Structure formats: structure tokens, C-alpha cells
Amino acid sequence: MVIELIINTPSRLHLTLIDLNGERGRLDGGVGITLNEPELVVGLEASDDMGVEFTSHAEGKLREEYRSKIMEAARRTLKHIGSDEKFHFTVRSMFPAHSGLGSGTQLSLATARLVAEYHGMKFTARELAHIVGRGGTSGIGVASFEDGGFIVDAGHSSREKSDFLPSSASSASPPPVIARYDFPEEWNIIIAIPEIDRSVSGRREVNIFQEYCPLPLRDVERLSHIILMKMMPAILEGDIEAFGESVNEIQGTGFKRIERELQDPLIDRIIDSMISAGAPGAGMSSFGPAVYSVTDEKPGNVAGAVAEIMGPGRIIVTGGRNRGAFMIK
């Protein structure tokens, strides 16, 4: 009998990195939101050969990126557990790579979890991340995979990590989570992913970290104040106006300001359109190009305003997801 295992994992917004100065003895730190949509669904079956197929539509370049990440994560996991099994993976649902929604971490962790489950082995999300080499800068993707929700991570001690590097180039362990709260179910999140060629990954991403860091300590202190004394209380109190204001303030502070400056001017126009349409707050996820806004009423107005100016791309109206990845079967 052929046994198929299937996993569902979320996407995430990465609102900002916190400390790219390091003077206080820690680096990185991050804030993020787990999303209901888009989601990743991947299946696994034992096979005579390793392979990956797709039942969801995707262009060739995206398929190759997914295939490469799946094969690498499977190889590392099999090596870790000492198995020579072979598997056929089926990607049933997917979302764009290098768009700011965290597909790389989710795909690697999903693959590792499937391989481990097949062998009857249980690992935490942090353990899986260590196996497949994810979470070396931001812990938001790993924490989203584990428990979902609104997340703040603590970054890394300078004793473990002394260089300014993105997660894809860092061997550090996933950082501890400082806070994890349920994201208010009544809040809508509107995501816009314009088709622009400004994705940042690989060597270019490493170069950006090396060129712009360390950032001034005053930027880190201001950002920390916004997060601790405005954004986190807003989540706990359900105050969407204060939450939106904190998102807006983050856009011109610290590393987020640099990420925004490196993007296409269309990003600024989309964010402005979201605010003008009534969203209390709007910003860019990670290096983009995904842009997001939050609102508790008339999300269609915000989505419509974006559609008028964005051109080719995708608009998603969704919400926060307060659970992590789960096995469908």
C-alpha cells in the first residue's frame, strides 16, 4: 500500500528586523505575522527515485527553485537521520519565491517534517530548522511554522553570531521567541505582490547586509520603542489604529528604511494607495516586493485602490493564522 503524507504550512509577513547594530550584545531580532493565505501544501510518497512534481500552476523558474529547495532539504534530513530512502514529492499549493512571504523557510521545513514523519521521528520546528539550515537571522518563519500568530524573536547573541548576514547565509541557530500572541481574527490583511523585478536574494542580499550594517544605535532604540510600547500592546488590546501607526512608523526606521529605498517606486505608490483607501497601516514585507496593509473594515476598498495602480500582480485578502503547520494526513 502506498502511503502519502501531506503537510500544510503558512506564509508570513516579516515586518522588520530589529537590531542590526549589535552594540548591546545581540544581533537581528524580528517581528512578523503568520498568514492564512497563501499557503503551501506538499505531499510525500516512497519511491524508487527522488523526484518532485507540481499539481498547481507555476512558471518554470519557480518550479526549479521549489525543486531545488525540496531536494536539498530532503538530502540534509535523510543524512541527519541516517536513511537512504527515496521519495516522490508533490507540490499541491505554492506561493512565489523571493516575494517577501517566506517560501524558502516554509518549503525546507515542510520537506524535513514530511521525511521525519515518514520515519516515525518527531522534531521541533527549531530542530528541523537546524537540520535544513534555516532561521540563521530571522526566527519569524520558523516560529510561524511552529505555532503561527504574531511573533517577536530575540535575535542572536554576539557570541553565536558576529556577522551581519541574511538567514540564507547564516549558520546560527533559530533565535528564541520573546512573544507570541494570537493575531486578532477580526482584522483583515490585504497583500499586494506586484510583478516587478526587484527581488533580493542570494549574493545580492548578503552584499546589502554587508554594505549597510551596522546601523546607528539610535535607529535600533527607536525601533525597539515602537515595537515594545506601541505595536505589542496594540495586538493585546485589539487597537488597530495604534497597530497601523506602528507599522507606518517602522517603514522609515532602521533596516526597513533601507529595504524600502532599494525597491521600485511602485512599492511606495501601492502603500500610499492603501493608506488613502482607509487602511490604518501599510508596509513592505522583508525585502518585498510583497506589500501589506491591515484594516478592520471594508478590505475591498483597499484591494480596489491597489488594483487601480498596481498593474500585473496578485492581490490577496486574508487574515492572521494562529496555528502553525499541520499534517493533513
From Swiss-Prot:
<dbReference type="GO" id="GO:0043793">
    <property type="term" value="F:beta-ribofuranosylaminobenzene 5'-phosphate synthase activity"/>
</dbReference>
<dbReference type="InterPro" id="IPR020568">
    <property type="entry name" value="Ribosomal_Su5_D2-typ_SF"/>
</dbReference>
<dbReference type="GO" id="GO:0005524">
    <property type="term" value="F:ATP binding"/>
</dbReference>
<comment type="function">
    <text>Catalyzes the condensation of 4-hydroxybenzoate (HB) with 5-phospho-alpha-D-ribose 1-diphosphate (PRPP) to produce beta-ribofuranosylphenol 5'-phosphate (beta-RFH-P). Also catalyzes the condensation of 4-aminobenzoate (pABA) with PRPP to produce beta-ribofuranosylaminobenzene 5'-phosphate (beta-RFA-P). Only 4-hydroxybenzoate is known to be biosynthesized by methanogenic archaea, but 4-aminobenzoate can be used as substrate by growing methanogens when it is present in the growth medium.</text>
</comment>
<dbReference type="Pfam" id="PF00288">
    <property type="entry name" value="GHMP_kinases_N"/>
</dbReference>
<keyword id="KW-0808">Transferase</keyword>
<keyword id="KW-0328">Glycosyltransferase</keyword>
<dbReference type="InterPro" id="IPR004422">
    <property type="entry name" value="RFAP_synthase"/>
</dbReference>
<dbReference type="InterPro" id="IPR013750">
    <property type="entry name" value="GHMP_kinase_C_dom"/>
</dbReference>
<dbReference type="Pfam" id="PF08544">
    <property type="entry name" value="GHMP_kinases_C"/>
</dbReference>
<protein>
    <recommendedName>
        <fullName>Beta-ribofuranosylphenol 5'-phosphate synthase</fullName>
        <ecNumber>2.4.2.54</ecNumber>
    </recommendedName>
</protein>
<comment type="subunit">
    <text>Homodimer.</text>
</comment>
<dbReference type="InterPro" id="IPR006204">
    <property type="entry name" value="GHMP_kinase_N_dom"/>
</dbReference>
<comment type="similarity">
    <text>Belongs to the beta-RFA-P synthase family.</text>
</comment>
<comment type="pathway">
    <text>Cofactor biosynthesis; 5,6,7,8-tetrahydromethanopterin biosynthesis.</text>
</comment>
<keyword id="KW-0460">Magnesium</keyword>
<dbReference type="InterPro" id="IPR053442">
    <property type="entry name" value="Beta-RFA-P_synthase"/>
</dbReference>
<dbReference type="InterPro" id="IPR014721">
    <property type="entry name" value="Ribsml_uS5_D2-typ_fold_subgr"/>
</dbReference>
